[in-house]
Every structure is written in structure tokens, then in C-alpha cells.
Amino acid sequence: MPETIQRQRLAILGLGKMGSILMQAFRKQNVVQAENIFATVQHAERAATLASKFGIQVTTDNRAAVADADIVLLCVKPQVLGDVVQEIAGGIRENQLIISIAASVPTAYIEKRLPEGIPVIRAMPNTPSMVGAGMTAFCCGVSVKHRDLEVARTLFGTVGEVVRVDEKHMDAVTGLSASGPAYVYMILESLAEGGVKMGLPRDIATQLAAQTVLGSAKMVLETGDHPALLKDAVATPAGCTVDGILELEEGGLRVTLIKAVVKASQRAKELLFS
């Protein structure tokens, strides 16, 4: 962890679902002290409620929140990000780091709305961040320095794994790891339904399916083996698994999942921000 990050002041603009997940992780792991977190929401009543609940400062004033911040985390929707950046631009200082988690919004879009030389990082976490098992990919704008990278790695490392990619790959990240949990939930749900169809109680079927998905993913990560090799190790000759795989192949599982990632990635590209 960068030595000074605990003492840095963090502004979180947009304390919605992901903003709240990140803020609570920062607090829980003492990456940023509660008294140094300033967040914003749209309504004063909600600001008061969240301030009382989490022990941080919450306001409806974006400019006030960023005034003394060292790090500004933009957690607002892509459709309003431009307005928010223009709102705070006049109060941004040279040594502040801007991190955006808005899908499809390039670093250049943010940079040209801020004073020249402001470091901007674009990140894409996913919802398993809620349980500390998230996957965040990030890329850097033109003015980002090494210490800024380390800050980003530290912050997003509180909610899971972190990887740096070239910005040209960020739309693919959106289609794969950001949207991916929804695909996995559908697969998990279908596995459990198959168990129910064969007579298992629903709660046990769901537990079996969830742990199977979790354990299989862990084997890929910890062994480093290609998924195809791990699959083949389960599919013994003339066994039950081969019959199951045949059904999946006939149903087009592989092609359907590939097309889902491609389609979601293409949709991310269509949301042009310039």
C-alpha cells in the first residue's frame, strides 16, 4: 500500500450501489480512514441517512466534496458523467487523481473537460466486489504516473483482483467481466434447476451448483491449467459427463456464451462519448 494513502482524502461522487460497495471495502480494510471520506448523493435526506449509517461525510454538493480531496472517484452513471465533470472542473487541482468507473467513457472524454495534466484512470469493477471476489480492470490516461497506478491497485484490491489493460480493451472487459456475473448466474440457475428436475431439494441444488461453479473457477486460477484440460479430466471415457457435454454442445452453449460477450462488448462501443 502506498504509505500515504490512509491519510489522503477521498471524494466519492455518486454513492450508489458500486460506490457504496467500494466505500465500505475501503473502510473495512482501513485503506482510507472514515474521516477522510467525502461522498455525494442527489438528495439531502439520503445524504443525512448515509452519513449517519456509515460515519462519513455525505453531501449533495460535488464541488464541495472535491475541494480538499486528493483522490476523486467518479461513480455516477455514464449519461451524467460529462455534466458532473464540468461541474467540478473549476475546483480540480494539479495534484488530484481522478478515477472513473463509468462504463464506456474514455479517459480522453474526461481529460478534455478538466485542466490540462490531471491524471485520469478508467476502471471497471464488477458486482462480486460486494463479497471481496471482484475483478477490476483499469487503464490510464496520458498524465498518470506510477504512484497513481499504485493508488488504483490499492483501492480496487480491497474488493478483489486487479489487472491493468490497454484502453482499447476496456469495452471487451465490459462485455466479459463486468457483464459476466449475469451470465454465470444464469448458468448456475440452470444447473440448479436441472438438479431440481432430478429430484433434489431446491436449496441443496442451489448450494451444489454454486459451490461447483466456485470450485471450478478456483481450480482454473490456482492450477493455471487451460479450462479444456480440466474439463477433460472430469469427462472420463464412457462416463456420465460426456453425455452431459454432448447435450451442451448440441445446445450451442459455447457459441451462445461467446456471442453474449461479443454483443455486450459491441453495445459498450456503441455508447460513444467524445
Predicted regions mapped to residue ranges:
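NAD(P)-dependent Rossmann-like dehydrogenase/reductase catalytic/cofactor-binding core
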Residues: P2-Q6, A210-S274
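Short acidic capping loops at alpha-helix termini that bridge into adjacent secondary structure
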Residues: Q33-N36, E94-Q96, D203
